[in-house]
């Protein structure tokens, strides 16, 4: 997507009208992002949810977390973050369930059960979908962040996100573009950021809380991850990892690890990279993939049941770090045009 007109062209006025009608007709609404939420998932849930709460004060609106984990520390500054509740603790049968930043229902984790109890389902998303799971979907694959779609939808409905709510949406945009350093940071993304700042969003607060407030314990873990970086495929693929025991030894929680993949991505000459984090006693892993160019790492994530974009994707896998690397690294080598058989796993 090269300009804001492209974003407008993928928005159907009819679908938006029908979504608004569902919102207006619902007495109870539940909104959720994906499992292991990032800034865009949380910012989109909060931006949409808080806006609807202000515009429709008599509606029962629940803001859900797909997991039982707490809100990641770096995102707790956002307005309304204290309103987010685990989907497993929500017992309602909402008239309307709204999914944001979720391409497949499996990524809803515990929120999928709430979806199944709902009368109607709506989806806002910017990922490609293998199949639609919602009654109505406002899907714009070219948008840099789901927060952009939420902002445009609200504006088209006559609802303007301002100040703290606008900051939530800006956080989604900033984090999903890697501080406007990824390939998706196009003219439309900058235009959306300008709109949000004009409406009171605070970019300095986003930068401070998300990127400039690291705990010393996290920096110790970061140094471990940096020390483990390896490259394969003639330096075109990089990877690193952290065991659950590393997090425990450093005093770091799992939710603080968002962003460690960018340490691996920063290696000169690397085209794609992988960061793995051990969970559940290192019997499972969560993986983050990044690409510096046009190579599509979401294809790799899809092989593990995950998803994402060309430049950024994630997945979970039942297996150890070594086992996951043994499968993923040959795929990444093939993606960059190198011989998969040449790859050996080093820990």
Language-model segments: residues:
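An acidic intrinsically disordered interaction segment
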Residues: 2-18, 113-121, 142-144, 148-150
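Hydrophobic helix-and-loop "lid/oligomerization" segment in the mid-to-C-terminal part
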Residues: 2-35, 43-76, 91-96, 175-303, ...
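Short glycine-rich anion-binding loops that position phosphate/pyrophosphate groups of nucleotides
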Residues: 35-37, 102-105, 127-129, 244-245, ...
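Glycine-rich, phosphate-binding/catalytic loops in enzymes
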Residues: 47-49, 114-117, 139-140, 191
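Short, hinge-like loop/turn segments at secondary-structure boundaries
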Residues: 49, 78-83, 139-142, 291-292
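Active-site cofactor/cluster-binding pocket
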Residues: 76-79, 83-136
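A generic local secondary-structure boundary/capping motif
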Residues: 86-88, 110-113, 137-140, 158-160, ...
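Short alpha-helices
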Residues: 124-193
């Amino acid at each position: 997507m090269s300009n804001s007109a492209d974003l407008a062209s993928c928005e159907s006025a009819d679908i938006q009208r029908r979504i608004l009608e569902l919102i207006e007709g619902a007495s109870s609404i539940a909104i959720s992002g994906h499992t292991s939420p990032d800034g865009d998932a949380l910012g989109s849930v909060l931006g949409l949810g808080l806006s609807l709460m202000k515009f429709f004060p008599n509606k029962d609106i629940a803001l859900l977390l797909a997991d039982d984990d707490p809100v990641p520390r770096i995102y707790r500054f956002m307005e309304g973050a204290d309103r987010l509740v685990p989907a497993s603790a929500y017992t309602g049968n909402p008239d309307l369930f709204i999914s944001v930043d979720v391409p497949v229902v499996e990524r809803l984790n515990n929120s999928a059960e709430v979806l199944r109890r709902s009368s109607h389902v709506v989806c806002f998303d910017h990922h490609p979908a293998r199949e639609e799971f919602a009654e109505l979907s406002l899907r714009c694959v070219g948008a840099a962040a789901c927060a952009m779609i939420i902002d445009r939808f609200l504006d088209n409905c006559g609802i303007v996100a301002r100040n703290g709510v606008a900051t939530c949406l800006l956080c989604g945009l900033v984090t999903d573009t890697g501080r406007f350093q990824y390939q998706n940071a196009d003219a439309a993304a900058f235009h959306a950021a300008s709109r949000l700042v004009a409406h009171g969003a605070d970019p300095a607060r986003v930068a401070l809380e998300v990127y400039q407030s690291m705990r010393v314990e996290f920096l110790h873990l970061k140094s471990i991850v940096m020390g483990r970086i390896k490259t394969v495929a003639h330096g075109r693929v990089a990877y690193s990892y952290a065991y659950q025991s590393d997090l425990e030894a450093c005093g770091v929680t799992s939710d603080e690890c968002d962003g460690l993949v960018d340490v691996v991505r920063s290696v000169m000459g690397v085209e794609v990279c992988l960061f793995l984090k051990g969970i559940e006693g290192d019997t499972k892993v969560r993986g983050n993939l990044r690409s510096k160019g046009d190579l599509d790492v979401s294809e790799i994530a899809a092989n593990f049941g995950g998803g994402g974009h060309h430049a950024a994707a994630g997945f979970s896998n039942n297996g150890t770090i070594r086992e996951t690397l043994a499968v993923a690294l040959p795929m990444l080598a093939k993606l960059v045009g190198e011989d998969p058989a040449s790859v050996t796993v080093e820990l």
